[in-house]
Amino acid sequence: MSTQNYHIVAVPPNEWGHMRPMIAFLARLVAVSLNSVDITVTLIIAESAVAKARTELSIQLAGEGIQSAESRFEVVPTAVHMFWPADAYLPALKATYAEVIKKKEPDFALLESMIHPFFDVVRSSATKPIKVGAWLPVALPSWTSMAPICYIRDDPQAYVKQVETTMAEKGLGYMEAASDAYLSHVNGRVLRIPGFPEMTDYEGFPQEPPVLLPVAMVVDWVFGIRDADILVTSTAQALERQGLQVFSKWLKEQPKHSDILAVGPLTSQRTPEVARKEKEEADAGGFTAFLDAWAAKKGPKSVLYICFGSVLLPAEIEHLYAVMRVLLELQIPFIMVLSDAARAALPADLAAAVRDSGLVKLTPWAPQQYILAHAAVGWFLSHCGINGTLESLCLRVPMVCWPLFADQPVLSILVAQVYGCGYELGEVRKGFGLKYRASTGKTPGGTVEDVTREAREVFSKAFFNKAERAKVDANLEKMATELNAAWDAEGDARASALALLDFIRK
């Protein structure tokens, strides 16, 4: 075993969908390094997320058979509320980082790509060689092949100049000009992306405009891709193999000549200890009782799980209400993650129907992997974020896809159209989402009536058509088998982790 210690400093943002997979990856990286490299990790975490991060770290380490974190991990709080824009986080993050490197400078920094302005801080603070990796918890190759990201990716300086020109000519502020310039590249052209059906560029915006993701954040994110010494993404080879090959070739042609390492899936290792902790949470929240009861009443695969992540709900909330009404009509029991505020805003008649049906459990939070692993759960209605998508596929739960923004539209197409592991809801759209879709040959209507009709068709097929379910299950089995082998001894994700260790040691 190497006697030299290698120190990693890692900085995720406080969005849980970005932080959790980074913690999971670092736990696995340390686990695979135990017999070859001495690794210690300092995690710089927003103060508000420290307790949650420590709990997740203990779960992930338990899953890897590592009982004590103290000798390998240190969690350091920083007085940051949001990791964007730069002037909101840089002063506090600089101060925290300065204290960290007083103890020991890192050999490698793993930084969320969107905090690209912090890359220079890390490099300029170093008194010895340091390598900077960009962390990208998205379906990176597929999303960056969509317009307008592909144009910004290929020439970000030209986009910055376009924004400046737009500001001068239209008298707009920076944020407005950035969105204006961004959307000017979306005009209905046909995209031909390896591994996908033909698509129109509108298909990347099922709920927009107005844009849901600050465009200036996307620009920082793209600069991070181009400026990093190596890229680490939580997507999986089984999901984006063709895209990763094409993206890797593109990346090698850029000035940094960097590599990209795909380390997904990062679902929790379901050891007895992890399963016990998950069940304790589920029992306390009433999830186990709900699922067990419906498994007894309706049998396995009879419950729908609904979650749109921790940030947004669908842009047209009436669409969501329409789908809920259809589920009640079809007598499909469901667990739905819904904030207290969103629950309070439910129309009175729908709230009463939900309450009186006995079919529904509404909750502001849910133990997602536990629920997806339960025998009662048959389908997952999801926005198709990368984490939930991989969790669902690994656990052999088919998906009903309702993408909102970012990489979710391409993941929806991969799941439903390319791999046949679920269905898309095509009518739950607005803005550019109502334009013609080359991938389906359809133009969505987007009315509540259209949504209601489609929801009846899709959920009836999903829950009550055994022949269709058998087709989906066969596709799921193939995908799950490949995904679940990724961290085996010869798996591609494990190989990526080992490649990163080699990169750090060089």
UniProtKB/Swiss-Prot annotation:
One GO MF term: UDP-glucosyltransferase activity
Known catalytic reactions: 11-O-acetylcyathatriol + UDP-alpha-D-xylose = erinacine Q + UDP + H(+); 11-O-acetylcyathatriol + UDP-alpha-D-glucose = erinacine Q2 + UDP + H(+)
Pathway entry: Secondary metabolite biosynthesis
Record field: transmembrane: none
Induction / repression: Expression is induced under erinacine P-producing conditions.
Keyword ATP-binding carried by entry: no
Pfam families per record: UDPGT
Keywords: Glycosyltransferase, Transferase
EC number(s) on file: 2.4.1.-
Family: Belongs to the UDP-glycosyltransferase family.
Role played: UDP-glycosyltransferase; part of the gene cluster that mediates the biosynthesis of erinacines, cyathane-xylosides that show unique biological activities, including leishmanicidal activity, stimulating activity for nerve growth-factor synthesis, and agonistic activity toward the kappa opioid receptor.
Name this polypeptide is given: UDP-glycosyltransferase eriJ
Organism: Hericium erinaceus
